């Protein structure tokens, strides 16, 4: 990460719990790509949490982007990393997104008076 001077920034994250996860319970966490912009700047990931029986205990849906750690500005992914994401596991509803999709929740800051 430091070598490339890029890092992830999370825009939003939704966590849905289906069953209790105990502190000492062994779980498996999956990764699926739910969306990706053409140049890889923006992404949506889906993580599913499973117990040893394969029961889906929780799901995390998150969206974000990649920033240049020096300029602190959004940046596209290098081609070799972009290709890895493009060939990774995808959700059945995978889609290509743009910067407009990152604002779909229509949330605005509310400053203190």
Indicate where each model-derived feature is located.
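Short, basic/aromatic beta-hairpin or loop at an interaction surface
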Residues: 1-8
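HotDog/MaoC-like acyl-thioester-processing domains
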Residues: 17, 21-26, 34-112
């Amino acid at each position: 990460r430091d070598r490339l001077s890029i890092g992830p920034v999370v825009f939003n994250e939704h966590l849905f719990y289906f069953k209790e996860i105990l502190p000492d319970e062994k779980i498996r966490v999956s990764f699926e790509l739910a969306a990706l912009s053409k140049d890889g700047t923006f992404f949506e990931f889906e993580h599913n949490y499973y117990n040893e029986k394969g029961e889906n205990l929780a799901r995390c849906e998150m969206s974000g982007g990649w920033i240049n750690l020096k300029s602190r500005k959004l940046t596209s992914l290098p081609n070799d990393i972009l290709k890895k994401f493009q060939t990774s596991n995808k959700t059945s509803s995978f889609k290509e997104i743009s910067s407009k999709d990152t604002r779909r929740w229509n949330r605005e800051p509310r400053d203190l008076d």
